[in-house]
Amino acid sequence: MTPLLITLLIVAGIALLIVIGYLNNVVENGKIERVRTRIELADRLRRCGEITETFPGQFMSPALKLLLTRLELNLNQRQLAVDKHNAELKARITELEGLIALGDQIPVNNPPNPIHTEVKAKDVRFLLEAMHNQVTRAAQEGFLPAVEAKHWVKEIRHILVLLHIEFFNNLGQQALQKNQPGQARLAFERGVQYLRKQPEPKVYEEQLTYLEKLLARANAQVMDRMAPAEDEHNELTDGLKTDEEETWKKKVMYD
């Protein structure tokens, strides 16, 4: 065997090892990518399902329910492409396709969930943020047209405003029921200020007028409490009158 042939065999062997290593790396990267995709899609599906199931009914419209169902269907179809033999995914896809076929008649079974506490308001706000992320991600991936995505981003912001209106209104009404006009005034005042800062305040003109009336009512109750009645006598008012009389007598004596 000539030295040239030996050299060629060595070079061929090295090249073969490089090719094998490259192919193994490609296969391994493909497996890792599939696992990563499966985990990411599962997380997005979980978040989408959480929004669909727990979003308060007073903010959930058939159009919004239909959007969330479409987003969930898209994620399930992509996950099925990675896990082709998953019977559970196939069944869910069939169910979602049936719901989407109903269009605006899609059932909305979310019960109303009044926003009475700041904790509850934050929970719903987090759901809205998750919804916003789902919409923008779907637009970036080409599933949602840009015009439709823009519409839903605006609608999500509108729902956020409605959330604040309900929160401040409920907070103030609770304070009035507890005979705490000061706390009620603070809640209504926050609501009024929030609406006045909106980019399009005319959209919420009716709600603003309503909160302003409640603010005036709470403020009147606070002022009534602060002003003593004309015929009311207590230790403080009597003490003040006594001090005024003593001061007047001393002034007369020294003058």
Regions found by a protein language model. Give the residues of each.
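N-terminal signal-anchor transmembrane alpha helix of single-pass membrane proteins
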Residues: 1-39
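Long, non-transmembrane cytosolic or organellar matrix-exposed soluble domains/tails
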Residues: 167-255
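TPR-adjacent "capping" and linker segments in tetratricopeptide-repeat scaffold/adaptor proteins
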Residues: 32-35, 148-167
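Helix-turn-helix repeat elements of alpha-solenoid scaffolds
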Residues: 61-71, 139-147, 188
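Alpha-helical linker/edge segments of TPR/alpha-solenoid repeat scaffolds
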Residues: 85, 99-111, 138-145, 159, ...
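Repeat-mediated protein-protein interaction surfaces in helical alpha-solenoids
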Residues: 17-22, 133-157
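N-terminal topogenic membrane-targeting module
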Residues: 23-128, 132-135
